[in-house]
Amino acid sequence: MANKATKKGSKVYVCALAQNTDLIQSAYVALTWVQVGKVGNVGDFGADSTMNSYNTLDEPVTQKQKGTANAGDPQIEVASVFDDAGQIILRTFGDPLNLDNMAIKIERNDGGAGKTNTIFYSRGVVSGPLYPGGGSDDFELERFTIGLNQLPIRVNPTIIP
């Protein structure tokens, strides 16, 4: 069993071409990816279903069922670099008049020697950048929110032939 991994060394990639319909893994793999530079933080993503409940007179316990799933709204925080190609793509999709979905690829640094890393693929609309305030010791940052419109596709590590 592999040792546990931290987020250090993980990478975020984006695609400049809009992806407005659900994709399968092979379609994501075929896209042209641009790495986003100076990523400092990636927010939560993944299936988060609503929990619907209904009380009936004949049941002593509230009855529950899953409802609609939210794929997530992760924030991508970057140290602002005006000419970073990945950040430029994020800014382009973040324009309030841009209603297209952007494809995103998140690669963990967890495969180890002789293996690929875990990869997540998804797509969604982008909001931002938000420019956080701060003081004299704070970096100039930008935050983008990705409203995912497809459940992430997880690709586990495999042995490199």
Regions found by a protein language model. Give the residues of each.
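Viral virion structural and adsorption modules
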Residues: 1-7, 147, 151-161
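A structural detector for beta-sheet-dominated domains
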Residues: 15, 37-40, 79, 107, ...
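Short beta-strand and beta-hairpin "edge-sheet" elements
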Residues: 107-154
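Solvent-exposed edge beta-strands and adjacent loop segments
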Residues: 2-77, 125-138
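Surface-exposed beta-strand edges and their flanking turn/coil or helix-capping segments
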Residues: 51-54, 89-91, 134-141, 157-161
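Hydrophobic beta-strand residues in large extracellular and virion-surface proteins
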Residues: 12-14, 104, 146
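Extracellular/virion structural assembly segments
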Residues: 59-122, 154-161
